[in-house]
């Protein structure tokens, strides 16, 4: 049986949002789209700025375009001190990338700004050391 937006649509939507016990899927078909260079990476802030950084993240991410993924997190800075970070991946037109992330670069006093052009695969591998194979995080 095939389920899609147009064929067996009720089953398709049930599988999409029905949780882990709705049925057994034996194969998937994906439509892939090429992704060139993206603008990605983290900007780290001192942990003492966590409240302000989270409020900034809340406001910034709500107004961000669909081409920008933005995540807030807590973790160690390269020197070992506790920090908060905004991790971003901008996949839109390259000429608009810097303009889109400018508010992040202008916010607060970053400990480190590692936002840079990279491949989408590099963005996907950014947290590999923190989530090793076998933990089933995806």
PLM regions: where:
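Soluble FAD-dependent oxygen oxidases
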Residues: 1-138
């Amino acid at each position: 049986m095939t389920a899609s937006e147009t064929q067996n649509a009720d089953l398709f939507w049930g599988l999409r949002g029905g949780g882990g016990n709705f049925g057994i899927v034996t194969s998937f078909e994906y439509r892939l789209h090429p992704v060139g260079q993206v603008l990605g990476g983290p900007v780290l802030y001192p942990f003492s700025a966590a409240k302000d950084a989270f409020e900034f993240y809340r406001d910034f991410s709500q107004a961000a375009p669909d081409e920008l993924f933005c995540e807030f997190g807590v973790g160690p800075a390269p020197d070992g001190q506790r920090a908060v970070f905004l991790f971003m991946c901008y996949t839109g037109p390259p000429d608009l990338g810097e303009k889109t992330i400018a508010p992040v670069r202008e916010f607060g006093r970053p400990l480190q700004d590692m936002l840079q052009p990279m491949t989408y695969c590099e963005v996907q591998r950014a947290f590999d050391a923190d989530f090793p194979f076998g933990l089933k995080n995806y």
